[in-house]
Amino acid sequence: MKTNADLTTKPKPAGKSFLRKHSLGLGALAIVVTLVVAYMRADPATHLGSFFGNAIADWTGVLVTVIMTKHLYERGSAESKQPKGKLRSPILEFLRGHSLTVFLVITWIGWAYLFRRMDTGSRWGQVVGNLVSEWTQILGLVWMTKILIEVGSKEGAR
């Protein structure tokens, strides 16, 4: 016979699935892929084609923000998690503490280099130009969250 304790004990919830744990990143990735496919089929000279090209850069920025802010750090930013512990090498500690900026700067240089070598008026040249702009905005926002505050945000609570 079951006791009252047995009847009131809730079963342990099952572990969250991969899809549940990563649904935001996967959702953003699905949107980027959908936009790339739509852009490949659209005429970039039309409003709709132009929209798809611009949206690729915007949503790639969302994807990078979701994924990279989960795994990388930016010391001094209230919006970023802070690294635990300290590394022995001051150089490695600096790179880890600013790994989000390091990643964004390196990939920004890559996008800028690619853009410089492309025809800016070509289909993908416009998209890559928008990606350079998007990366500049993300990097600027990361740095601004280290210095500036906004009432009601995490920075404003400092």
Functional labels for PLM-detected ranges:
Residues M1-S17:
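Short, Lys/Arg-rich, polar N-terminal cytosolic tail immediately upstream
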Residues Y73-L87:
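Membrane-helix interface/capping segments
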Residues Y39-R41, A45-H71, A78, Y113-E150, ...:
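A structural feature that tracks compact, well-ordered secondary-structure segments
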Residues T3, G156-R158:
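Short, charged juxtamembrane terminal tails flanking transmembrane helices
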Residues S23-G27, W59-L63, S99-F103, W135:
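Alpha-helical transmembrane segments
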Residues K12-P13, A28-A45, V105-G121:
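Polytopic alpha-helical membrane-helix bundles and their juxtamembrane interface segments
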Residues A14-G25, E93-S99:
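N-terminal membrane topogenic signal
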